[in-house]
Amino acid sequence: MARAKFERTKPHVNVGTIGHVDHGKTTLTAAITMTLAAQGKAQARKYDEIDAAPEEKARGITINTAHVEYETEKRHYAHVDCPGHADYVKNMITGAAQMDGAILVVAATDGAMPQTKEHILLARQVGVPSIVVFLNKVDMVDDEELLELVELELRELLNEYEFPGDEVPIIRGSGLKALEAMTANPKTLRGENEWVDKIYELMDAVDNYIPTPERDVDKPFLMAVEDVFSITGRGTVATGRIERGRIKLNETVELVGLRETRTTTVTGIEMFKKSLEEGIAGDNAGLLLRGLKKEDVERGMVIAKPGSITPHTKFEGEVYVLTEKEGGRKTPFFAGYRPQFYVRTTDVTGTITSFTSDDGSAAEMVMPGDRIKMTVELIQPIAIEQGMRFAIREGGRTIGAGVVSKIIE
């Protein structure tokens, strides 16, 4: 078992394929698994296995997502691929499958298409940090100038959405040709087939260009309060799941949201009725807070490293509005609509002041099934930050899912 243990030391990165329908995302995903399986670094997955993506629920929304995993010399990857366009929209907005980087698949025969643009825009809005491009189906294009033109257009498009279009690696290849080569001889290694080599070239780009994300435990401490108790003779305990960072005894923290920010000291950390010296990301813990009464703390506040997060009331969000079939509204809504925004552990009422379409023009109303950018004003300040996910609820049921794309005030 020594081998398995050794591999756990590789950094883990979450990636996904994005791009226009029928440009070859799933074929490429299958080709990557089969190519790396020849080195024993992946389980080979056929196209049909990936395409028949199981349904999952994220924030009450059903999404079809396929997950595959593989590794390179440098890293371990979890890779997500979605069968339908709506699944991508929902996946990226809910953050159901977090992406530290994306592989944008573009067919050389078509160039950039509407969903290519939409996926780049979404990646920008939801905070996908890096994109690597795979120019697919190049075996079907004889004209070198045409390929260069498509690349140029893609770089301009990436720049337009604030990705460094001039630096983004663009790898030319053919997912299908690589898949055919690997199917004919599953033991094909690097240097034995030109199309398989393109898959290795792509993985090199992913390895080297997509930065290793900072681990949750290394980020500034944050825990959203779920419940508050009073323990006679000891004080007030707030419970919740530590979202990121670590907390040690006697560290100073801030209580942020709903009221004036307050500073306090953590005098006890408990988990499963046992005292701990330290709590880390992922732990469900109870924190004993010095000098606070039970009524000073409420669900929806966050306990965080001082200065790391601030309360806000106005933000812009990229939102997917559920269809009636998904349990959402039957009717459209307009600016001035006042639903609840469920953030981390609590609902806060807010007014949607305006809607913006992808082209920057104002939209009058929003229909179930739409994706839209909206400006929201909450009635109480809460701890929010760019990239944070939220749900929109009406009478306790979810009618939309969103991500904060910009803080206004």
UniProtKB/Swiss-Prot annotation:
Q: Which UniProt keywords apply?
A: Cytoplasm, Elongation factor, GTP-binding, Hydrolase, Magnesium, Metal-binding, Nucleotide-binding, Protein biosynthesis
Q: Which InterPro entries match?
A: EF-Tu_GTP-bd, EF-Tu_GTPase, EFTu-like_2, EFTU_2, G_TR_CS, P-loop_NTPase, Small_GTP-bd, T_Tr_GTP-bd_dom
Q: Region labeled G4 — which residues? A: 136-139
The kind of enzyme this is, by top-level EC class, is hydrolase
Task: Name the reaction it catalyses.
Answer: GTP + H2O = GDP + phosphate + H(+)
Please state the span of the N-terminal signal peptide per the UniProt entry. none
EC numbers listed for it are 3.6.5.3
Q: List where in the cell it is found.
A: Cytoplasm
Q: Where is this region: G3?
A: 81-84
Q: Which GO terms describe its molecular function?
A: GTP binding; GTPase activity; translation elongation factor activity
Any one GO CC term of this protein is: cytosol
Binding positions (Mg(2+)) = T26
> Which one Pfam family would you cite for this protein?
GTP_EFTU
Give the UniProt family note.
Answer: Belongs to the TRAFAC class translation factor GTPase superfamily. Classic translation factor GTPase family. EF-Tu/EF-1A subfamily.
Q: What does this protein do?
A: GTP hydrolase that promotes the GTP-dependent binding of aminoacyl-tRNA to the A-site of ribosomes during protein biosynthesis.
Protein name per the record: Elongation factor Tu
Q: Give the source species.
A: Thermosynechococcus vestitus (strain NIES-2133 / IAM M-273 / BP-1)
